[in-house]
Curated annotation (Swiss-Prot):
Family matches, as NCBIfam families: PRK00364.1-1, PRK00364.1-2, PRK00364.2-2
Species in which this protein is naturally found: Vibrio cholerae serotype O1 (strain ATCC 39315 / El Tor Inaba N16961)
Keyword Cytoplasm: yes
Task performed by this protein: Together with the chaperonin GroEL, plays an essential role in assisting protein folding. The GroEL-GroES system forms a nano-cage that allows encapsulation of the non-native substrate proteins and provides a physical environment optimized to promote and accelerate protein folding. GroES binds to the apical surface of the GroEL ring, thereby capping the opening of the GroEL channel.
Taxonomic classification: Bacteria, Pseudomonadati, Pseudomonadota, Gammaproteobacteria, Vibrionales
Pfam families, alphabetized: Cpn10
Keywords: Chaperone, Cytoplasm
Recorded name of the encoding gene: groES1
Name of the protein: Co-chaperonin GroES 1
Length: 96
């Protein structure tokens, strides 16, 4: 992938959510919402602080993350893949 996010931006590929319940029922509509989990494909150099220094990001390439789908979430198609461009503050957790 040939993309480099700037500053505190992160490129995430959404992971597919299971479309069946634990009991085997196929979920549709709002019950089968888009996943808010994904794999980090690229990260920016960090957040620029008021004093001009750069604070590195906590997430790294390859991390699986849980993110908030917010107004600022940008979806792009890059190399045939649909990816999200998020600010690091939209990432809620790293799955370990």
């Amino acid at each position: 992938m040939n993309i480099r996010p700037l500053h505190d931006r992160v490129i995430v590929e959404r992971q597919e959510v299971e479309s069946k319940s634990a009991g085997g029922i196929v979920l549709t509509g709002s019950a089968a919402e888009k996943s808010t989990r994904g794999k980090v494909l690229a990260v920016g150099k960090g957040r620029i602080l008021e004093n001009g220094s750069v604070q590195p990001l906590d997430v790294k390439v390859g991390d699986t993350v849980i993110f908030a789908e917010s107004y600022g979430t940008k979806t792009e198609k890059i190399d045939g893949k649909e990816v999200l461009i998020l600010a690091e503050h939209d990432i809620l957790a790293i799955v370990e």
